[in-house]
């Protein structure tokens, strides 16, 4: 084992590296960068499942999927390197009232990769890809639940915060299990083993129940913060879109889980013969209510953006994922309700998300090359 002086030398080397300009990206990297995965992944999912397809669209989705996988492993490598070189930064991140909230972006970004495996790889590669996605999903679900349970408790016990300094980023660790539950519905729908599918959707309903009501509590507190202290600072104004995330993804998750329940419950004689139909109908009903609730939060966000200028930062990725998951709920309602209205609206939202992804991705690459995002 290294001696005390050996540890000192390691720390000294890490400190010297931190001061070098070419290490600044690793030194100042934080979990919020995984929002790039969230935005890229949801864009690939939307294009793959667009109600109105055209030749070549599938290949664009495949390219984005591959890009997302590359970015994810790049960011994971940078994160591991950062905390190996500067172990104290991990504790500092957990103690930071803002950066700790961004931990939720890691499993949510990973969930988009799992969904793309189901949508893109399973139809080509078959059952083994479905089982592979299922295994990855269990990892994602465990990490999501751990973050959802741990970070809010840190907020209660360790972080110094006030109503005035609150932002919608408080939702991020709580939304992670909502995304995992929705992803579980997608994975379960691809499983050929009905027992595995049943276990998966029951776990998903439990995760949904753990996270969505808590997200609603946060929304109440956030509305009170806005009513009393007015809009958040301009640097964080893009976070105004975050509330539509749990509402859109929560609604999509219930509908997707209902689809699987309708198919699997009768086969396994689970509960009553009509249990699957009840879960399916109730899921669609609650999803419609959540979607409607999301509309007013979307209006609040859009109205907030008109109140003044705001400048680019990594938080701009909130332009993509929250609206993206709201769009998945929209297109799913078009599918389940056989509604051209929701198909057209979902297509419009998908185009908006794709355009925002192009803009934000280009700015992110440029600002990363100039290292402005790391200072």
UniProtKB/Swiss-Prot annotation:
InterPro entries: SLAC1/Mae1/Ssu1/TehA, Sulfite_efflux_TDT, Voltage-dep_anion_channel_sf. Pfam families: SLAC1 (PF03595). Induction: Expression is strongly increased during growth on protein rich medium containing keratin or cystine-arginine. The keyword Cell membrane applies. One of its GO terms (cellular component) is plasma membrane. GO terms for molecular function: sulfite transmembrane transporter activity. Gene3D superfamilies: Voltage-dependent anion channel (1.50.10.150). This is Sulfite efflux pump SSU1. It comes from Trichophyton rubrum. The lineage of its organism: Eukaryota, Fungi, Dikarya, Ascomycota, Pezizomycotina.
